[in-house]
């Protein structure tokens, strides 16, 4: 009986953990670290840890509220039907309360322990994801991912503000990289999930404009992304190394985008989606390495 109770507690904790969309959270925290490391100045390690905790909680808050609001469409989509709310493992009201609570806590702690600018940016990113993307754009326009992608682009900007207590053109460049990355990344996935989006009545770009136009736009945004990714060389310490990495990784990204147009199949789109994740991690890892004099 005691073991059974422990297993139930563990299962509940895991369900609430999944509400936070942990895979997105890892990327959010990693890009925030890049913003902190690339920023001029320094911060006490304990404050840096507190900041990253707040950013992670803020990201999780947006994810939990998103799952609460999207519980109806999650239920009919193959990709999302096993999430905690549609599967019945977590009550919708509990998910909403959980999301709001950790969101408020994350912003409050950031404001008290770090600075008001980073707290304000964190609040804006949460509110943008919930109200602008989830509630307003997602079910209304095929540009949902393009505009809504701004929510996921804030973390390096927040990380920069944690250290500098300011927003600058350098941090905006880091924001812009993720903003340009989001459409080709997500459209590569949505091309393979068109039936899901049709069932859920979500006007994804590929559903409204068709796969041919979507693939062309994947290439367009990929080129814009690669061009944008070169800009951090203007302020990084090891700019030549970074530039080399950005060019090599960017050429591979464009090659995958061209493959999506040329092959027009599930496999090329899946590979594009998978590589786009590796690409962003690698690019921001290069930003970190080129900011701390490791070589």
Curated annotation (Swiss-Prot):
Pfam name, any one: UbiA
User: Any idea of its EC number?
Assistant: 2.5.1.141
Keywords assigned by UniProt? Cell membrane, Heme biosynthesis, Membrane, Transferase, Transmembrane, Transmembrane helix
Its cellular-component GO annotations read:
plasma membrane
Entries under InterPro entries matching the protein: Protohaem_IX_farnesylTrfase (IPR006369), UbiA_prenyltransferase (IPR000537), UbiA_prenylTrfase_CS (IPR030470), UbiA_sf (IPR044878)
Cell location? Cell membrane
One GO biological-process annotation of the entry reads: heme O biosynthetic process
Pathway, according to UniProt?
Answer: Porphyrin-containing compound metabolism; heme O biosynthesis; heme O from protoheme: step 1/1
A single MF term (Gene Ontology): protoheme IX farnesyltransferase activity
List membrane-spanning regions.
27-47, 48-68, 94-114, 117-137, 144-164, 171-191, 216-236, 241-261, 272-292
Q: Which top-level enzyme class is recorded in the Swiss-Prot or TrEMBL entry?
A: transferase
Q: Which reaction does it catalyse?
A: heme b + (2E,6E)-farnesyl diphosphate + H2O = Fe(II)-heme o + diphosphate
Main location, first listed in the record: membrane
Membrane topology term: Multi-pass membrane protein
Indicate whether rRNA-binding appears among the record's keywords: no
Q: Which family does it belong to?
A: Belongs to the UbiA prenyltransferase family. Protoheme IX farnesyltransferase subfamily.
Q: Any remaining note in the record?
A: Carbon 2 of the heme B porphyrin ring is defined according to the Fischer nomenclature.
Write out the function statement from the record: Converts heme B (protoheme IX) to heme O by substitution of the vinyl group on carbon 2 of heme B porphyrin ring with a hydroxyethyl farnesyl side group.
Q: Which HAMAP family match?
A: CyoE_CtaB
Q: What is this protein called?
A: Protoheme IX farnesyltransferase
Gene behind the chain: ctaB
């Amino acid at each position: 009986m005691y073991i059974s109770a422990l297993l139930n507690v563990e299962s509940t904790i895991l369900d609430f953990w999944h509400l936070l969309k942990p895979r997105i959270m890892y990327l959010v925290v990693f890009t925030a670290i890049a913003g902190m490391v690339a920023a001029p100045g320094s911060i006490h390690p304990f404050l840096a840890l507190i900041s990253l905790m707040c950013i992670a909680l803020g990201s999780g808050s947006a994810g939990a509220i998103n799952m609460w609001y999207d519980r109806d469409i999650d239920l009919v989509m193959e990709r999302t039907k096993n999430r905690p709310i549609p599967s019945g493992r977590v009550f919708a009201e509990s998910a909403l309360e959980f999301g709001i609570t950790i969101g408020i806590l994350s912003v409050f702690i950031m404001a008290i322990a770090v600075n008001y600018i980073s707290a304000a940016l964190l609040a804006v990113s949460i509110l943008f994801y919930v109200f602008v993307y989830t509630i307003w754009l997602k079910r209304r326009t095929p540009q949902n991912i393009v505009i809504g992608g701004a929510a996921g682009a804030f973390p390096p900007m927040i990380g920069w503000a944690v250290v500098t207590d300011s927003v600058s053109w350098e941090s905006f460049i880091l924001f812009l990289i993720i903003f340009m990355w989001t459409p080709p990344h997500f459209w590569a996935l949505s091309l393979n999930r068109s039936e899901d989006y049709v069932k859920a009545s979500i006007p994804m770009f590929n559903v409204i404009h068709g796969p041919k136009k979507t693939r062309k736009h994947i290439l367009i945004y990929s080129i814009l992304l690669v061009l944008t990714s070169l800009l951090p060389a203007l302020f990084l310490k090891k700019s030549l190394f970074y530039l080399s990495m950005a060019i090599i990784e960017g050429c591979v990204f464009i090659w995958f985008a061209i493959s999506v147009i040329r092959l027009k199949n599930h496999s090329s789109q899946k590979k594009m989606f998978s590589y786009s994740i590796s690409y962003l991690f690698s690019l921001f890892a290069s930003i970190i390495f080129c900011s701390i004099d490791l070589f």
